[in-house]
Amino acid sequence: MLQPKRMKFRKMFKGRNRGLANGTEVSFGEFGLKAVGRGRLTARQIESARRAMTRHIKRQGQIWIRVFPDKPITSKPLEVRMGKGKGNVEYWVCQIQPGKVLYEMNGVSEELAREAFTLAAAKLPIKTTFVTKTVM
């Protein structure tokens, strides 16, 4: 699972997921999976989608993961009264804004890349679209 090696502080405020994304262009590969909606991806969802793509392309080509889960999400145990401090870190998430490129792929045909990204998109909780690299 993806998570930071070390952080200055273990727990984080909830914050808000507003604004526009950085990393909106396909920069490493030929094809990309771009977020259309707004939301957050857990480390498990990112890994699950990566595995689905890797299996479908049968380890040909190359895949880049353009997102990293760097925000800790805490929760208190079941049946615990309110108060007594913030809960323990349960999992890590990456906040996604519209336009963010999540994955990139290279070295495979467009048809195969499109199928692989469709499988990956089924694992993710946000709407996505298939994009290709634009040549300037």
From Swiss-Prot:
Domain of life: Bacteria
Swiss-Prot/TrEMBL keywords: Ribonucleoprotein, Ribosomal protein, RNA-binding, rRNA-binding, tRNA-binding
Coiled coil: none
Biological process terms in GO annotation: translation
Cellular component annotations (GO), alphabetically ordered: cytosolic large ribosomal subunit
Keyword tRNA-binding belongs to the record: yes
UniProt-listed InterPro entries: Ribosomal_uL16, Ribosomal_uL16_bact-type, Ribosomal_uL16_CS, Ribosomal_uL16_dom, Ribosomal_uL16_sf
GO-annotated molecular function: rRNA binding; structural constituent of ribosome; tRNA binding
PANTHER family noted in UniProt: 50S/60S RIBOSOMAL PROTEIN L16, LARGE RIBOSOMAL SUBUNIT PROTEIN UL16M
Biological function: Binds 23S rRNA and is also seen to make contacts with the A and possibly P site tRNAs.
NCBIfam families xref list: rplP_bact
Entry's family note: Belongs to the universal ribosomal protein uL16 family.
Complexes and interactors: Part of the 50S ribosomal subunit.
Identification of the protein by name: Large ribosomal subunit protein uL16
Organism whose genome encodes this protein: Shewanella loihica (strain ATCC BAA-1088 / PV-4)
Origin organism lineage: Bacteria, Pseudomonadati, Pseudomonadota, Gammaproteobacteria, Alteromonadales
